[in-house]
């Protein structure tokens, strides 16, 4: 083969592989379409590669999905925006295939390209494509059509706009529920491009059709449209057209529709204004909180704080809190868990007095819940309550429960408590901490679960930073060093880790006098894992202590370890010795 032909050779291979029987090869080639296009140049890409892709009737969904994705970013390779329209035919074909994810990606790419196209090209090429898909024999084409109307509409002349609105209306009444679902899903996007005069007539007419659909899968997607349309309409129109629909939906016979309402309701409050919220939406939300279907209560409970933020505190206390109290003892653990994940956020909304009177008892009952996730969700948000009621009240009312949870049988709960301790310590102050929580922090170092022991070691470091080296020297270091001879080597490893974390906080003097001797003793341990961890630790201590200490205490210890029978111990000891030499050379 001549030298001239050489650069074209890999491209020829890639093009051949587009037709290869092996799926993986076809896929690799499709993912390199941009390389092929760059090699062919813009004109040949337009005239040869794109037509080839349009005719490519590959039957593998993975290949088609990759093609749909690649073509979305292909404008650059066909000669820029003025030639963007040449990419539409292959994507039109892809948007009619059976596999949903391929169609969705093709629609995404059509929208990406359409958003960059010139207005004249949109009218000449993109809008006819939308019309063809809308009239497609297979429902797959009509489903895809719904997703591109918001791109086609804005640049169309008035006559064409009228036609597009009419076509979308027909899609909303299509025989196939899959098409009506797509029309409901995309109605908000389409509505955002429509002039306000037509919004109140054409779009609201389509919306009404969808809200009265006999398929609950269509109605629940129409619920999502409520919030989107509500933001586009004037408040009075929203009250007239959207509010009655939402109130009806909140009592729909299908729990899936009610579930969607529970998820969306708080967004509508802003659209309709305070008075309709008070008279219509608050009772609707209270109904959903007490719904007979657990899934609906879960959705409603998860939005309780967001909903209460929109109301004034009196309304929340009067109408929502009684339902919240009921939910805190709900028969479904998932409802209680959803409530626990957000209820702490109600404290800033309701204020100090209402929190103390109404919320604290609920917090306490959830902290003692039999289901660990419920307890976990409360613990992780305690700081939100502390900001409202102050640490004294928090410690009196909730601390006994927190101390109890520190020994919880579920390790994730213990872990959440440990991670909360430094924050609690900083707010409780040193005296309170020593009395109530100090012993717990030591106890965790000998937990059965590795993650707890590791978190406990990190916790000691954070406490030493919070209360200072003097306090740590009195309350942490002696207790930690006592444990370094624990019979179980895994616990000895934890103590070593705690020592290595404390050393930078404690400073050179305490490290040399108290911590380093304990580490050197540990270097004579019978377990190789301990010894190589000592070697790693020594390396981290080099920057903390004086050069004389490094030479007189650390180096001899490492030299001894570098002659250990165990290969890992020797490796880490030599690494640490290398570090010492590097420090010596640089100084």
Curated annotation (Swiss-Prot):
Superkingdom to which the source organism belongs: Eukaryota
Query: Where does the protein end up?
Result: Cytoplasm, Cytosol; Nucleus
Q: Give start and end residues of every HEAT repeat.
A: 2-42, 44-80, 81-119, 158-194, 197-235, 236-274, 276-313, 314-352, 353-391, 393-430, 432-469, 470-508, 509-547, 549-586
Q: Does the keyword Chloroplast apply?
A: no
Tissue spec: Expressed ubiquitously at stable levels. However, higher protein levels in roots and flowers (at protein level).
Q: Name one GO biological process term.
A: regulation of phosphorylation
Q: Which UniProt keywords apply?
A: Acetylation, Cytoplasm, Nucleus, Repeat, Ubl conjugation
Show the InterPro entries listed in the entry. Answer: ARM-like, ARM-type_fold, HEAT, HEAT_type_2, PP2A/SF3B1-like_HEAT, PP2A_Regulatory_Subunit_A
Residues that bear N-acetylserine:
2
* Keyword Cell cycle part of the UniProt annotation: no
GO cellular component terms, alphabetically, are: cytosol; extracellular region; nucleus; plant-type cell wall; plasma membrane; protein phosphatase type 2A complex
Name of a matching Pfam family: PPP2R1A-like_HEAT
PTM (free text):
Ubiquitinated. CHIP-mediated ubiquitination enhances phosphatase activity after an abiotic stress such as low temperature or darkness.
Assembly description = PP2A consists of a common heterodimeric core enzyme, composed of a 36 kDa catalytic subunit (subunit C) and a 65 kDa constant regulatory subunit (subunit A), that associates with a variety of regulatory subunits such as subunits B (the R2/B/PR55/B55, R3/B''/PR72/PR130/PR59 and R5/B'/B56 families). Interacts with CHIP. Interacts with SRK2E/OST1.
Instruction: Report the function annotation for this chain.
Output: The A subunit of protein phosphatase 2A serves as a scaffolding molecule to coordinate the assembly of the catalytic subunit and a variable regulatory B subunit. Involved during developmental process such as seedling and floral developments. Seems to act as a negative regulator of PP2A catalytic activity.
Question: Hey, which family's this protein in?
Answer: Belongs to the phosphatase 2A regulatory subunit A family.
Which additional comment does the entry carry? Answer: Due to the stability of its transcription, PubMed:16166256 proposed this gene as a reference gene for transcript normalization.
In the record's own words, the domains note is: Each HEAT repeat appears to consist of two alpha helices joined by a hydrophilic region, the intrarepeat loop. The repeat units may be arranged laterally to form a rod-like structure.
Q: What is this protein called?
A: Serine/threonine-protein phosphatase 2A 65 kDa regulatory subunit A gamma isoform
Its taxonomic placement starts with: Eukaryota, Viridiplantae, Streptophyta, Embryophyta, Tracheophyta
The gene designation is PP2AA3
């Amino acid at each position: 083969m001549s030298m001239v032909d050489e650069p074209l050779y890999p491209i020829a291979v890639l093009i051949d592989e587009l037709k290869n029987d092996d799926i993986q090869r076809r896929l690799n080639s499709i993912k390199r379409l941009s390389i092929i296009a760059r090699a062919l140049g813009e004109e040949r890409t337009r005239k040869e590669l794109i037509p080839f892709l349009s005719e490519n009737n590959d039957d593998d969904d993975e290949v088609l999905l990759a093609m749909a994705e690649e073509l979305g970013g292909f404008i650059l390779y066909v000669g820029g925006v003025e030639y963007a329209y040449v990419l539409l035919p292959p994507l039109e074909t892809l948007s009619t295939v059976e596999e949903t994810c391929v169609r969705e990606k093709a629609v995404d790419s059509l929208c990406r390209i359409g958003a960059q196209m010139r207005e004249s090209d949109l009218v000449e090429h993109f809008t006819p494509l939308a019309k063809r898909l809308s009239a497609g024999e297979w429902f797959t084409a009509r489903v895809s059509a719904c997703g591109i109307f918001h791109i086609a509409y804005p640049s169309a002349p008035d006559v064409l706009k009228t036609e597009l609105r009419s076509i979308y209306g027909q899609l909303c009444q299509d025989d196939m529920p899959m098409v009506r679902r797509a029309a409901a899903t995309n109605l908000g996007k389409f509505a955002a491009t429509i002039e306000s005069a037509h919004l109140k007539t054409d779009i609201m007419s389509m919306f009404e059709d969808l809200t009265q659909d006999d398929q609950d899968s269509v109605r629940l997607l129409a619920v999502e449209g409520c919030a989107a349309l509500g933001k586009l309409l004037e408040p009075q129109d929203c009250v007239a057209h959207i509010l009655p629909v939402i109130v009806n939906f909140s009592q729909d016979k299908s729990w899936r529709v009610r579930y969607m309402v529970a998820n969306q309701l708080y967004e509508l409050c802003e659209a309709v204004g305070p008075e309709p919220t008070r008279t219509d939406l608050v009772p609707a939300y209270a109904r959903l909180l007490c719904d007979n279907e657990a899934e609906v209560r879960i959705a409603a409970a998860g939005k309780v704080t967001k909903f209460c933020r929109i109301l004034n505190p009196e309304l929340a206390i009067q109408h929502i809190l009684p339902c919240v109290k009921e939910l805190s003892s709900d028969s479904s653990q998932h409802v209680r868990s959803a409530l626990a994940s957000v209820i702490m956020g109600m404290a800033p909304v309701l204020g100090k007095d209402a929190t103390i009177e109404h919320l604290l008892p609920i917090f306490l009952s959830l902290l003692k819940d039999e289901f660990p996730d419920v307890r976990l969700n409360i613990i992780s948000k305690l700081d939100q309550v502390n900001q409202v009621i102050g640490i004294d009240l928090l410690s009196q009312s909730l601390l006994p429960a927190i101390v109890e949870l520190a020994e919880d049988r579920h390790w994730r709960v213990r872990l959440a408590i440990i991670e909360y301790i430094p924050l609690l310590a900083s707010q409780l102050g040193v005296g309170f901490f020593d009395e109530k929580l100090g012993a717990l922090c030591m106890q965790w170092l000998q937990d059965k679960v590795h993650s707890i022991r590791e978190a406990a070691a990190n916790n000691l470091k954070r406490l030493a930073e919070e209360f200072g080296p003097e306090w740590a020297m009195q309350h942490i270091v002696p207790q930690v060093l006592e444990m370094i001879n624990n019979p179980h080597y895994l616990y000895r490893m934890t103590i070593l880790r705690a020592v290595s974390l404390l050393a930078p906080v404690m400073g050179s003097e305490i490290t040399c006098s108290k911590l380093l001797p304990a580490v050197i003793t540990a270097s004579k341990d019978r377990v190789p894992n301990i010894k190589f961890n000592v070697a790693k630790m020594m390396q981290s201590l080099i920057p903390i202590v004086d050069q004389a200490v490094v030479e007189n205490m650390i180096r001899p210890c490492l030299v001894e370890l570098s002659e250990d029978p165990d290969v890992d111990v020797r490796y880490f000891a030599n690494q640490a010795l290398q570090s010492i030499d590097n420090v010596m050379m640089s100084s």
